[in-house]
Amino acid sequence: MRQYTGMYIIRPTLDEEATKAVIADIEKVFTDRGGKILEVNEWGIRELAYEIEDFTKGYYVKFLVEAGIDAVDEYDRICNIKEDIIRHILVKED
């Protein structure tokens, strides 16, 4: 398993409970596939550099995870499907 740093941006229109549910769903993607969440930093609502899907702000979440390729692929798939996530990225640590 390798370490990855990731970030995703959640729609700012969600209430706190729904935002926490999205974060829990993403963590579950990794833990259900044998991965470990090493760190999660919720940056909160911040201005976007440019408008995304008519939003000028987003709720940023940055994380560090140790996971296999199947969890990485599932993370990408889930983030593309979930309408509450407007952007995501995952980068392999050296």
Regions found by a protein language model. Name each.
Residues 2-94:
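Structured, basic alpha/beta domains of bacterial-type, RNA-associated proteins
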